[in-house]
Amino acid sequence: MEAKEVVQRGYDLFGAGDMETFFGEIIHDNITWTFPGDEGKHPLAGVHKGKENFIANMSKIPEYWDNFMVTPQAMISEGNKVFALVKGTADGMDTMFGHYFEVENNQMKVMMTFDDTLTAFNAMKK
């Protein structure tokens, strides 16, 4: 699979709620997920290393946002690197995000999120 296809498959699985396949097949054991921001101010902020840490932090999403969904609008791919322009929605949220990936052996090994943190924060369940 091309890197762009791996990333699209990840979004498809995430959107379908097939987290077992998403985490089991798409996420590399040594993934590094960087979510810029001050840890403690935003529940997802920080550098999360390893699949277990990735799963633990991704699992926070339903705790803070009802009906959270990410839908890619466009992707640019160069070699193993992919950048996705993503529509992010949840109850009280309708915005755009940018997600950067590096793919290795048909799995996401690096993910960096450039999200509209103010809109997401304002939509969080308090």
Feature locations, PLM:
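C-terminal and inter-domain tail/linker signature
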Residues: M1-K126
